[in-house]
């Protein structure tokens, strides 16, 4: 799909930042309007992250206009908002391929463009990496500048504050731009405040500020008075001095949709020494009313009709696993006031909207703070409550030490509802849930369950909730199979279920690839086992299958290395059972973006692929 660039005459003149910087500044508002419309048209036809990009159009234009990218380093935190950046950096004609197999990466990606200096996807990494680049630039001595753009959500994470504290300590030259879209632009982000921001960022003010400090350095009372006067001046129109306490020179807030103010302020700040923080106010979804009204709903969108102002409904009548979890959570909370649900800023994605409204006293959104979420849950468990941590597989990686040190070592009854296990689709390498079975399986005291359908998911959540120790239920992104939901009951810990009896080959399946494995088993006349538990492994059943069959095949949507299949291998070797084993799962690579079924087919994890791998191995 390609758009008629003739409809965007100013944008047509700026295929890359070099061309953008040749435009007269008077044309920048027109460029922003066209860029926003181009983004709207492209995403509506191809799907993708939407509201965040609309909110940073003016900022993106201003940054590339003022800074000499790619020589100067521009870093986008997380990267949801980077579509305008990609459009302006030579990828305009390919933006409609974003998040698709073999298309543009969903986030800034070093291998895709020299303008993407940091590969991202997870939040709050930009300032740490940016500080490292700033230190390297100082050693290089060529005047290279470093700019990090981070949102008001991502900056709350501990890693961001750790980086700012370090930056303030070593006083490296860098600019952090806080993109604050939590509220609409208010009156105090108007003329006076924009004027003050330009004044405070100007060279004359900076010179007087530093000169005054030096002149009165021997007179502490006067120096303190000057500092208090400066803070009082800022305090009339800006937020707290938190960033100043961390060692940053704070400027703002300014209107993030006034491209002229942004360019002038950035020009003023470009040559300032030491760590700088520019606070801008933006509106997520800017320029498209439905997205402005519901930025969360329009965060990532399927194809839609811009004229309708609505998103298409899901075509599937089957519930998602996230919905199954959310319904179970509400059902359990209705009977048990000790349940406490914890999420690190993933309420919508984890299916917890209804729970948060109906049980607000039992719901904790701890923001983007996975480490805190896990240890907070440990504290709740020590206090006699029953915490349930709802977290994506890829984000649990960020709290690995807390999982071991604060939960497992103390054998605390914390249930982890791990969403997005396995292939997630369009978000690619940074979001695949490829490693959780591997990194949890080696932790003592953990019970790890992998349901084959939505009914088993409910039963496992119930079982894990009532287990007196740490437990994890790991389920995928997407819809269930249509399984009948049975009354909740405890499953026997560490016991699998024989689903089909065959000959010679026994397929041991962990998780929701069971339906695909079933088809392969029927075609091969193989035995099929729903293993259910990754840990503790059903050793008795595995050894029985080894005794009755010529070969074993393990199937899982997790990295083969260290995964559930590795557990089977370890058991057989420990018991001196010399049975050939084929491990089928995710290969030793970071799986790129693509539709889930598309990538399963490519990786040999659909029914045909499983059968093909087995037949090739036996040939």
Swiss-Prot record:
GO molecular function, one term: magnesium ion binding
CDD domains: TPP_DXS (cd02007), TPP_PYR_DXS_TK_like (cd07033)
GO biological process, alphabetically ordered: 1-deoxy-D-xylulose 5-phosphate biosynthetic process; isopentenyl diphosphate biosynthetic process, methylerythritol 4-phosphate pathway; terpenoid biosynthetic process; thiamine biosynthetic process
Pathway: Metabolic intermediate biosynthesis; 1-deoxy-D-xylulose 5-phosphate biosynthesis; 1-deoxy-D-xylulose 5-phosphate from D-glyceraldehyde 3-phosphate and pyruvate: step 1/1
Record EC number: 2.2.1.7
Cofactor(s) required, per the database record: Mg(2+); thiamine diphosphate
Entry annotated with the keyword DNA-binding: no
Residues that coordinate or bind thiamine diphosphate: 80, 121-123, 153-154, 181, 288, 370
Top EC category: transferase
Binding locations of Mg(2+): 152, 181
Gene Ontology, cellular component aspect: cytosol
Cofactor note text: Binds 1 Mg(2+) ion per subunit. Binds 1 thiamine pyrophosphate per subunit.
Task performed by this protein: Catalyzes the acyloin condensation reaction between C atoms 2 and 3 of pyruvate and glyceraldehyde 3-phosphate to yield 1-deoxy-D-xylulose-5-phosphate (DXP).
Family: Belongs to the transketolase family. DXPS subfamily.
Complexes and interactors: Homodimer.
Alphabetical list of NCBIfam families matching this protein: dxs, PRK05444.2-2
Entry protein name: 1-deoxy-D-xylulose-5-phosphate synthase
């Amino acid at each position: 799909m390609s758009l008629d660039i003739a409809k965007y005459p100013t944008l047509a003149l700026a295929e890359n930042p070099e061309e953008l910087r040749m435009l007269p500044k008077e044309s920048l508002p027109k460029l922003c309007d066209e860029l926003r419309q181009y983004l709207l048209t492209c995403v509506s036809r191809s799907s993708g992250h939407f509201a965040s990009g609309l909110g940073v159009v003016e900022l993106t234009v201003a940054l590339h206009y003022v800074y000499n990218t790619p020589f100067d380093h521009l870093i986008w935190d997380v990267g949801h908002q980077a579509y305008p950046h990609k459009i302006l950096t030579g990828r305009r004609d390919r933006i409609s391929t974003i998040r698709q197999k073999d298309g543009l990466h969903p986030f800034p990606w070093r291998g895709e463009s020299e303008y993407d200096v940091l590969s991202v996807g997870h939040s709050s990494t930009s300032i740490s990496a940016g500080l490292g680049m700033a230190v390297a630039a100082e050693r290089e001595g060529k005047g290279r500048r470093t700019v990090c753009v981070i949102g008001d959500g991502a900056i709350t994470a501990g890693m961001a504050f750790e980086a700012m504290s370090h930056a303030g300590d070593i006083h490296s030259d860098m600019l952090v731009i806080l993109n604050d879209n939590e509220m609409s632009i208010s009156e105090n982000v108007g003329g006076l405040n924009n004027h003050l921001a330009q004044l405070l960022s100007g060279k004359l003010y900076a010179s007087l500020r530093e000169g005054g400090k030096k002149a009165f350095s021997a007179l502490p009372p006067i120096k303190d008075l000057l500092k208090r006067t400066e803070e009082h001046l800022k305090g009339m129109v800006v937020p707290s001095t938190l960033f100043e306490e961390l060692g940053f020179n704070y400027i703002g807030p300014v209107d993030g949709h006034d491209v002229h103010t942004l360019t002038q302020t950035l020009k003023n700040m470009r040559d300032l020494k030491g760590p700088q923080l520019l606070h801008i106010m933006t509106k997520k979804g800017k320029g498209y009313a439905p997205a402005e009204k519901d930025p969360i709903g329009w965060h990532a969108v399927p194809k839609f009709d811009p004229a309708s102002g609505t998103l298409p409904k899901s075509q599937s009548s089957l519930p998602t696993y996230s919905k199954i979890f959310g319904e179970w959570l509400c059902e359990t909370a209705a009977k048990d006031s000790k349940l406490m649900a914890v999420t690190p800023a993933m309420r919508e994605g984890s299916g917890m909207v209804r729970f948060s409204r109906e049980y607000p006293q039992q719901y904790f959104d701890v923001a983007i703070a996975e480490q805190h979420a896990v240890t907070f849950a440990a504290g709740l468990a020590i206090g006699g409550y029953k915490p349930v941590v709802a977290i994506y597989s890829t984000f649990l990686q960020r709290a690995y030490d807390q999982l071991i040190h604060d939960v497992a070592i103390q054998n605390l009854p914390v249930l982890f509802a791990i969403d997005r296990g396995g292939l997630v689709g369009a978000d690619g390498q940074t979001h695949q849930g490829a490693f959780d079975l591997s990194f949890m399986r080696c932790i003592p005291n953990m019970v790890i369950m992998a349901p084959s359908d939505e009914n088993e998911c409910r039963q496992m959540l119930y079982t894990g909730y009532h287990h007196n120790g740490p437990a994890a239920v790991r389920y995928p992104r997407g819809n269930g199979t249509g399984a009948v939901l049975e009354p909740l009951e405890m499953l026997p810990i560490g016991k699998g279920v024989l689903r089909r009896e065959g000959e010679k080959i026994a397929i041991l399946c962990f998780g929701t690839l069971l339906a695909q494995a079933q088809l392969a088993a029927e075609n091969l006349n193989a035995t099929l086992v729903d293993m259910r538990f990754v840990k503790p492994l059903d050793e008795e059943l595995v050894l029985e299958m080894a005794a009755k069959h010529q070969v074993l095949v393990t199937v899982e949507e997790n990295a083969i290395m260290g995964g559930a299949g590795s557990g089977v291998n370890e058991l057989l070797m420990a018991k001196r059972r010399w049975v050939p084993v084929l491990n089928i799962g995710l290969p030793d690579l970071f799986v790129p973006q693509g539709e889930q079924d598309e990538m399963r087919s490519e990786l040999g994890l659909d029914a045909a692929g499983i059968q093909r791998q087995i037949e090739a191995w036996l040939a």
